[in-house]
């Protein structure tokens, strides 16, 4: 009996302690709940609704609708397309200008090159023309002077050697002599200073070259002075006219 009373007392004590613990927890829980609610009010952000009443289109994170984004992209694409078209037009214009400038420069280069060649040729021509009379004198001396003695032959050979050097130098510069004998008279190449009546050659044939002409390259450096064939006059009518008074 004594043991049973002890167990009953022990159980009642445990129940009493449990009741006290529950009361203590109940007395403390309202304050903790209030503190937790206030903390939630301070720290938790206000949630943004994902759907707007009256609008069935969902919004993106930045607040723009998909339709607005598509319209903005379309406008940006149209602007970029216009810029590309404008740049292409400018590129075509610049390309055309470049080609025109390049063509003008090429024409200028060719023109200046041609002018330079013409100037060089003119300077060369004027210089050689001053030397041709010396060549003429050498040729006259060779045709007219006939050395008789050994000393004269030595002198003849010496100046003929100078003449040969001069002619060789002119050849290297592109000078070549004309050979008009037997050809038809050409006013672009020849200068007629004499006419000789003859029936052995057609009229206008070059019979003799009196002063040698020269080419410089494919151009005339100096015209040849020539003697040209002319038709021979018929003297029979004149003789008949002279004899007719005597017969009368």
From Swiss-Prot:
Superkingdom in the source lineage: Bacteria
The name this protein goes by in its record: Protein GrpE
NCBIfam families per UniProt: PRK14140.1, PRK14143.1
GO biological process, one term: protein folding
Residues spanning the membrane: none
Compartments where located: Cytoplasm
Residue stretches of biased makeup (Polar residues): 238-248
Region (Disordered): 229-248
GO CC, any one term: cytoplasm
């Amino acid at each position: 009996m004594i043991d049973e009373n002890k167990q009953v007392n022990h159980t009642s004590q445990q129940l009493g302690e449990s009741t006290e613990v529950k009361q203590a927890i109940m007395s403390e829980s309202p304050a903790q709940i209030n503190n937790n609610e206030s903390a939630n009010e301070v720290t938790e952000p206000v949630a943004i609704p994902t759907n707007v009443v009256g609008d069935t289109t969902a919004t993106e994170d930045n607040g723009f609708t998909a339709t607005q984004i598509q319209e903005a992209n379309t406008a940006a694409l149209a602007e970029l397309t216009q810029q590309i078209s404008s740049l292409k037009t400018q590129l075509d214009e610049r390309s055309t200008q470049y080609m025109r400038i390049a063509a003008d420069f090429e024409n200028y280069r060719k023109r200046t090159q041609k002018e330079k060649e013409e100037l060089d040729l003119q300077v060369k021509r004027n210089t050689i023309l001053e030397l041709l009379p010396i060549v003429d004198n050498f040729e006259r001396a060779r045709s007219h002077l006939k050395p008789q003695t050994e000393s004269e032959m030595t002198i003849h050979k010496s100046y003929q050697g100078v003449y040969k050097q001069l002619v060789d130098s002119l050849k290297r510069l592109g000078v070549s002599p004309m050979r008009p004998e037997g050809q038809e008279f050409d006013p672009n190449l020849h200068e007629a200073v004499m006419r000789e009546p003859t029936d052995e050659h057609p009229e206008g044939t070059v019979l003799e070259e009196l002063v040698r002409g020269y080419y410089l390259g494919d151009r005339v450096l100096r015209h040849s002075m020539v003697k040209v064939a002319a038709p021979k006059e018929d003297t029979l009518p004149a003789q008949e006219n002279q004899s007719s008074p005597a017969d009368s």
